Amino acid sequence: MKKERFVQLQGDAVVAFEEYGDANGVPVIFCHGWPSSRTMARLTHEPARDLGVRIISPDRPGISRSSLHPNRKLADWPRVIERVLDHAGIGEFRALAISGGAPYAYAMAATMPERVRAIAIVCGAIPMVELEDARGLLPLYRWMLALHRSRPQLLRKLFCMARPILALRPPVRLRPLLLRMLMLRPCDAESLRDAAAFEAIFESQRRAWRGSAEGVMADAQIYAQPWGFSLEDVHVPVRLWHGKQDRAFSFRLAEEVAKRLPDCNARFIDNAGHYSLPIRHMREILEDLVSA
């Protein structure tokens, strides 16, 4: 792993990123979830190192150490990544997105097809504004979407109120209690009993909240907006992985996404949930991605 580095954007803005895996390997841009940050890519480090994969994991604008970009759109992301790629001396690349990182990987694939070889979408977020029936979403997501539409200022206040608590690091002895409070699928709870996996998931979330509530909110707003392109515009190979026990985004929603992608190889994994899929299957995911 390499220490955090920064790429200069327009004006005084910067984007922070870290690298994992093999520094001389096949380049893969990692798109973290929400709320999360670049250190979520710790999940990839050992398998990426063994497989000869170079993981470049940036914080999105406003997250952790990257500068806030108010009112940003999903369409702004490819330009940020171009700066990161040029800074790192990378031409063609692949992308790996987990959960809320999915729209960002799709955006790169749709607008940078000359550089994107393939993308892997793992328990990925779907185009939420296109949903006619939101029952396949986690209830918390349904509630936030409804509040964003009806009382956005209240939602912003709630984010600011939650930040001091969600930025805290809970004592190790309280982790079992935290896992019970989250009401996770058994497969997810079991996977998160691994200390390294727990840290990769939850420390990356805490880093996001420590940055600012405004940054987390700006990232959340992306999901409540049109993407600016359709899934049918993504012509690069897509490797879609989704657990049949996923509570955040039902695998039925993922099946509909797979049908719309022109070049998609989808795998729906039994007894895998939103957390256990990337924790248990990262080696297979990376092997499949670099072979595309």
Features from the language model and the residues they span:
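The serine-hydrolase catalytic nucleophile loop
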Residues: W34-E46, P70
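Conserved alpha/beta-hydrolase
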Residues: A48-S67
